[in-house]
């Protein structure tokens, strides 16, 4: 790897691509079980997807409000994350908050420790995960999500600036058509100018045709979801159009009657729909979920989200995504 070409990570215009580097079992243990990651195989696949472009590697750390949090940052976890940042790749590092006690002081300390430990490897730092999802795996299950975001974004922005680090800071959500949703109402009531000034992006996780079968055209569905998110949800709460949208998670699992060819088509059509909306809606990033299956033999859809099988052999969608990165990425 030492002789590999390094791709500078900067703020040029265009879509920045990425992928969650594991399987569902590594990110959400209650949704799937499977084989452990093989870092060498992951890096091989990431090199192929990246080509000569910038590339993000999405991964997750969880804050629980216990002594384990300090251990998480001080353990040899750092090499486990840094080893995927060859050739100029950066982490899209998600800090989930699973603390039921709403200990903001400990949350701030956790964010500061993560930045001190991982800062140079981070391209995007996401504060909380799916805070408007009130069931597993969303952070909305635990309460205080809005305070965790408002405080966390400002603290992270300040600490990165103090260290002269250029990572972007933001939060994400899942689609919501309810104008009275408590999360967004609380965001609108509590956010201030300092928060908006510290906010580099708002992310969206969305999975058309997964939990709910899609009726109609995929590109139209992507367009509808993203347009509503920008022009209704974000506008309604006062987040300006100058704040970019990141597509943080988007994917389609294979399985019985869920064919590899359909997954490849999903990736192609979804990415091109996002590209078509990039200028109009100020979308700057697209990240696929996820790189490999948790367990290719398991027919449950949560086990087959990958564009690689669990033995790291490619499905057709892998080459489709690689070609899209080469064509549309920066």
Descriptions of predicted regions:
Residues 2-113, 119, 126, 132-133, ...:
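N-terminal substrate-binding region of glycoside hydrolase catalytic domains
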Residues 3-45, 84, 117, 131, ...:
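Aromatic-rich peripheral "rim/lid" segments of glycoside hydrolase catalytic domains that contact
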Residues 33, 37, 69-73, 102-106, ...:
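Alpha-helix N-cap and loop-to-helix initiation/capping positions
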Residues 59, 87-99, 122-123, 129, ...:
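Aromatic- and acid-rich polysaccharide-binding/catalytic face
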Residues 66-70, 100-102, 134-138, 179-180, ...:
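Extracytoplasmic/secreted cell-surface and envelope-processing proteins
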Residues 80-91, 100-129, 144-161, 182-199, ...:
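An active-site-proximal structural segment forming one wall of the substrate-binding cleft
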Residues 145-146, 150-186, 234-255, 280-294:
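Aromatic-lined carbohydrate-recognition surfaces of secreted/lumenal glycan-active proteins
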